[in-house]
């Protein structure tokens, strides 16, 4: 059983961030009916469903129905967002059985706008969501990248939530169900780059990804579907995982010898080998 299944409900985004992989795939969004079909096939195979690989989930017009479908299948729904559309979707999120919301605050700096207005909107909505029982995580995953505004962002968070933060490794607890996570900027795996010291990864161990056309991929970083394992609309998940390619990936990591060229070029997977 997986811990996480990343289901891309849309590959369309309202921003253009320099840290994002982007895609040449055809712009597409799943219908609520298509998504329901997917989660029915994931039922019993994962604990959490993340509505993201690429794209901005809050642009989806059927977001409420999608989140409800996850809960109806006995799984927990998680969303990663750039935060710009939180105000417009506040009631939908409050009404939904949403387990966790992660907001990429580092998306703001590369897109511009009124920082205080953005942060106030994000913090107001997250405060209400946390009071409603949803875990809210603010992300600053830009260490070593575009981080000139981090000081202003941290200052705003302290002013809004107070400064009595509890530190734990690279994260801080700002209040009940409210967290701040710092991390280094990472590079998406690129088949054109050189190989890295990759020996192990959690792909196909604790997670799997489903792109918005139904293509199953080993993890949330295969944004172009470079390692297609099958299609969830055409095959059961068991059949996909029983494919020769999927088994080679799993056993390759077990033997510390990744079978896929893209995996051997993944900076994130390299962290498991350091």
Regions found by a protein language model. Give the residues of each.
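Conserved strand-turn element in the central/C-terminal portion of the radical SAM core barrel
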Residues: 108, 125-156
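Short loop/turn microsegments at loop-to-beta-strand junctions
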Residues: 204-206
